[in-house]
Amino acid sequence: MGSLYYSGSRMVRKDEVSCKLVMGDDKKTVVYAVRIGDGPIMQKVYEEYEKFFLTDVKDMVPEKFTIFPKKKLLQSKKTFFEKRRLWIQDVCQHLVDNQTKSEDVCRFFHIEAPDDDDNTVDLGPSERKTATANDFDFLTTIGKGSFGRVYQVRHKETKKIYAMKVLSKEHIRKKNEVKHVMAERNVLINNFKHPFLVSLHFSFQNKEKLYFVLDHLNGGELFSHLQREKHFTESRSRFYAAEIACALGYLHEKNIIYRDLKPENLLLDDKGYLVLTDFGLCKEDMQGSKTTSTFCGTPEYLAPEIILKKPYDKTVDWWCLGSVLYEMIFGLPPFYSKDHNEMYDKIINQPLRLKHTISVPCTELITGLLQKDRSKRLGHKNDFRDIQDHPFFLPVDWDKLLNRELKAPFIPKVKNAMDISNISKEFVEIQIDPASLAPQQLAVTHRDHDFENFTFVDTNRVLV
């Protein structure tokens, strides 16, 4: 028998199956809602349960379950539906009690198959302190990427709002991106609460997915604000560029190259401060002038040396800063073209052209950052210090900026932590399937060598 928990005054098995009748969205279709313990609810029409029974599990259950409920003459619909409900509940209970090693059963119910003892791994005391997907309510889709989606979630006990990034292990393996995901995890763990880098609260996994629980930033992407306003003032652009430079300088101190700076990876918080997110393309262990040669990044912001497949160093991030600063002021990246090959040719060969509508310090900064020869690029000698000391940033009080004591030039309209008005409708309209996102954990965490040591808990923010 499974473990017990209290529901009101009744003692309930943790893996007890309940089935209820509900009406579908069309108010006509009868739907059977199955729930295991206090887990997420799975809603399907009767025919789906019957098909699953006939095609996948018929041989796993006693003969009494092979007799399907049939409507008798003069029998009321209510009685007929109730018979179906009881049949579904009893069959599902039998399968959950006896067949959780079956892949078909686990897939249908979105539960974890128990592993043999020699396949389990003790992840230490922090494993118990960390969260699982079942500790959260999934509220809204707020982002989408190559390997998964980002959700606004609410912790059931504390009611705190977070962003949860959920990635598919299968997709990550197919694209050979395991190293990048683990690098992202390592960078997030070592952020040490930098004011302009998103913080990780928890990371955990199950058989199919990886989960990052992060700060929820609902002031909107810099990209969205830039699209709406076309361009920013020089003063506002300076504020954002200073924050970005601080974040990049901090990563460089930790021997990390970011490699994917772009407006889509910069989020505003409710106070109007920028926060750098998405560390999937970070390169670790880049001490001093050490170089690497992996071709990666976003086309519009690639430095010439990356396009030419030459060795590159930390100065690629300063090229990206120049590109983003240019875009904030003029509305498009500096060498933009819809044709990538044409754009690459411009990045490599075309001289930088700047309008005379900006100040001399701004012109000099962008020119220095977008120097095609990385050995002459601003930041090559003293990294962040070169950027910080540039005349363009003379109005910036760096200590007050890092302490978040400066008033932001723009404060987004945010009502509360759950406000999603600054999130793209493209994401918000994506339907959520809680049962697949938070499968019932019927066993200890299984060993996964590809993602070993992925699990993390910020001990200063333990939830449970």
From Swiss-Prot:
Catalytic EC class: transferase
Domain Protein kinase as annotated: residue spans: 136-393
Catalytic activity: L-seryl-[protein] + ATP = O-phospho-L-seryl-[protein] + ADP + H(+); L-threonyl-[protein] + ATP = O-phospho-L-threonyl-[protein] + ADP + H(+)
Coiled coil spans: none
Catalytic residues, chain numbering: D260 (proton acceptor)
Subcellular compartments: Cytoplasm; Nucleus; Apical cell membrane
GO biological process: intracellular signal transduction
GO MF annotation: an example: metal ion binding
Domain of life: Eukaryota
Annotated positions binding ATP: I142, G143, K144, G145, S146, F147, G148, R149, V150, K165
InterPro entries per the UniProt record, alphabetical: AGC-kinase_C, Kinase-like_dom_sf, Prot_kinase_dom, Protein_kinase_ATP_BS, PX_dom_sf, Ser/Thr_kinase_AS
Similarity section: Belongs to the protein kinase superfamily. AGC Ser/Thr protein kinase family.
Assembly mode: Interacts with pdk-1, akt-1, akt-2 and daf-16. Part of a complex containing sgk-1, akt-1 and akt-2. Interacts with let-92 phosphatase regulatory subunit pptr-1.
Name of the molecule in the record: Serine/threonine-protein kinase sgk-1
Species, as recorded: Caenorhabditis briggsae
